[in-house]
Amino acid sequence: MAAISINVSTVKPLGDRVFVKVSASEEKTAGGILLPDTAKEKPQIGEIVTVGPGKRNDDGSRSEPEVKVGDKVLYSKYAGTDIKLGGEDYVLLSEKDILAVVD
């Protein structure tokens, strides 16, 4: 199977989905011990790269997304689909899986 090259800027989420660049996980503990990849926890914070057009309502109209590109968000630990593009980690989430916008 051939590898497909996808540019992050071409990803357009559908509906109420958002595409989030995952923040890097901690490399070492507070005590200075380096963590191997298998011991690192999955980050739950990231920056929104693209936002879908919004959820479609019963009457056919769309609800405006509550988040925007550039927002730093906290999301559910097991939410979304993990995607790796260009050596970077991303997650495709439904807007309902976002718990908070972080300042």
Curated annotation (Swiss-Prot):
InterPro entries: Chaperonin_GroES (IPR020818), Chaperonin_GroES_sf (IPR037124), Chaprnonin_Cpn10_CS (IPR018369), GroES-like_sf (IPR011032)
Keyword set includes Kinase: no
Classification via Pfam families: Cpn10
A GO BP entry: chaperone cofactor-dependent protein refolding
GO CC entries: cytoplasm
Listed SUPFAM superfamilies: GroES-like
Keyword annotations of the record: Chaperone, Cytoplasm
Molecular functions per Gene Ontology: ATP binding; metal ion binding; protein folding chaperone; protein-folding chaperone binding; unfolded protein binding
CDD domains cross-referenced by the UniProt entry: cpn10
Compartmental location: Cytoplasm
Intrachain disulfide bonds: none
Quaternary structure annotation from Swiss-Prot or TrEMBL: Heptamer of 7 subunits arranged in a ring. Interacts with the chaperonin GroEL.
Entry's family note: Belongs to the GroES chaperonin family.
Function in brief: Together with the chaperonin GroEL, plays an essential role in assisting protein folding. The GroEL-GroES system forms a nano-cage that allows encapsulation of the non-native substrate proteins and provides a physical environment optimized to promote and accelerate protein folding. GroES binds to the apical surface of the GroEL ring, thereby capping the opening of the GroEL channel.
Name recorded for this polypeptide: Co-chaperonin GroES
